Amino acid sequence: MDNANCVGGCKFETRSFQYRRRIPYSLGADPLPPVHPLSLKNLVDIDTDLISSQLYELYDSIILNDSGLERRYAFVQKLEQILKKEFPYKNIKTSLFGSTQSLLASNASDIDLCIITDPPQCAPTTCEVSAAFARNGLKKVVCISTAKVPIVKVWDSELQLSCDCNINKTISTLNTRLMRSYVLCDPRVRPLIVMIKYWAKRRCLNDAAEGGTLTSYTISCMVINFLQKRDPPILPSLQMLPHLQDSSTMTDGLDVSFFDDPDLVHGFGDKNEESLGILFVEFFRFFGYLFDYEHFVLSIRHGTFLSKRAKGWQFQLNNFLCVEEPFHTSRNLANTADEITMKGIQLEFRRVFRLLAYNCNVDDACSQFTFPSLTDTSFMDDYVNELQLEIVPGFSHGRDSSDTSCTESPPEPSHFAWAFDPYNATASPYYNQNINSSIDYSSIYSNDVPAIPPNVPYTFVDPYTYACYINNNSYLPPSYMDFYTWYNSPYPKSSHHFDERHGGDRHEKNLSNSRRYSRNKFHKKKQSSGPFQYYPDAFSFTPTDNNSPPSNSSSSEVVSPVSLHSEPVLSTVQAFKS
């Protein structure tokens, strides 16, 4: 039996929470249609100075003050004295972690406490700790021993504070140190994370245990990765900077080292002059409309995005949003939210962006969400209908009808070139770049492009896969069906559809697999038979020769709206016939 918990036979171990799913199942799991960035309101048309002033005013009113900090330390000392009295031979110490130590706590935040014993094997169980707290007059004692991290929840009626205690989970204190170091790197980090956490709490989106949403730590990691990906970046990756690595930096077999001198990193983001209001608005624009949830993982350890396929997370449960734990890199912090919940959260991101873009009112954006009574079944239906309005980026609701700065149709394509590179998603989606007007680009922007009949061979390059190829010379998709997809096709883009269109013949798919193995040199031995014979350079794609498809395939030219290099371009590339 695990020393940290005791399942069964404990009167404090109870399902005290009434599970209240935050996002209704009736919202459905259908993917949101893509939204052209040019259909969103431009940043220059948003009063970000007004938003900044509102954010700072609200931040000053909710941030943890000195008196609140003193009450927290008094509560921790009280708990430690109780534990030492109840377990005198356990060598118990306590360590604060979480938002209080990382400087991200508000006056309404809970206390997170780690109970440390020496040696760890002599630790009391969560049920024993719960009983000890109850015997000493603490209220609302709850033992949750079956969670991934068993905890004891307790409330002090005198100090009006609640605390979550775990036992010997010291890696949580290291996560707090890392978060605190990031907060001290730039003065904009702390208010931005605090205000986004405040929004999430007001909208009931930061309760993974009860509502099936996200944790506050996951949201903080999303903000840090967002700041690492700004252009120029505001935060570095502290784990990638040179620092001491030895046996002392290993905990439970994990490398928990990082560059922990924020004074030397202070000023890293000075070249980025974006205000708090701009960052607040752009955070919701990015995660509401621009981030590629299907293919990428947020990693603050690497300070960038990682491929789900490269990490092997494309088949994990609840992997719509993937946030890599900075130390335990095989763990997805966001797996507490399923696909329907993440669809609802993405629509909540869009709701905030709409209110900020057209009303510039932070109070409206952070309005309190209140769960209805169990008998009120119409409330959640109305809420789902409200969320579904965010799917269409027309923003006809909640703004002045005379405002024509943003329409459902993007600007005239002859004056703009849109290029979105998922590996460098920080650049503004607005490029005032003249492009060749002699080419008809209307099919890129039109919302009513007729479906391409199955017998027409023209295809469109998938931007994600093409960007992977351009940025990595060794990259080759698992099959050419991933590389070239039907643009605006009513048919599913899957290998099953591929086989059906070829009469169930898998010969061409096997050819694609053989090309992949050849390109990556997985099979060194020459194939003596079969539809494909091994030649090392038979399909040598290089970025300098991106107009040369494999010699045994016919091709046709299409327009690819992707960024090939540092400059956004809209160029013709070769595509295979399907």
Curated annotation (Swiss-Prot):
It holds the Pfam family PAP_assoc. GO terms for molecular function: ATP binding; metal ion binding; mRNA 3'-UTR binding; nucleotidyltransferase activity; poly(A) RNA polymerase activity. Residues 516-527 have a biased composition (Basic residues). Residues 495-565 are annotated as: Disordered. Its EC number is 2.7.7.19. GO terms for cellular component: cytoplasm; cytosol; nucleus. It is an enzyme of class 2 (transferase). It catalyses: RNA(n) + ATP = RNA(n)-3'-adenine ribonucleotide + diphosphate. Residues 547-565 have a biased composition (Low complexity). Its cofactor is Mg(2+); Mn(2+). Keywords: ATP-binding, Cytoplasm, Magnesium, Manganese, Metal-binding, mRNA processing, Nucleotide-binding, Nucleus, RNA-binding, Transferase. Mg(2+) binds at residues 110, 112. Residues 496-510 have a biased composition (Basic and acidic residues). Residues 275-330 form the PAP-associated domain. GO terms for biological process: 3'-UTR-mediated mRNA stabilization; mRNA processing; RNA 3'-end processing. It is found in: Cytoplasm; Nucleus. Interacts with pab1. Belongs to the DNA polymerase type-B-like family. Polymerase that creates the 3' poly(A) tail of suc22 mRNA. This is Poly(A) RNA polymerase cid13.
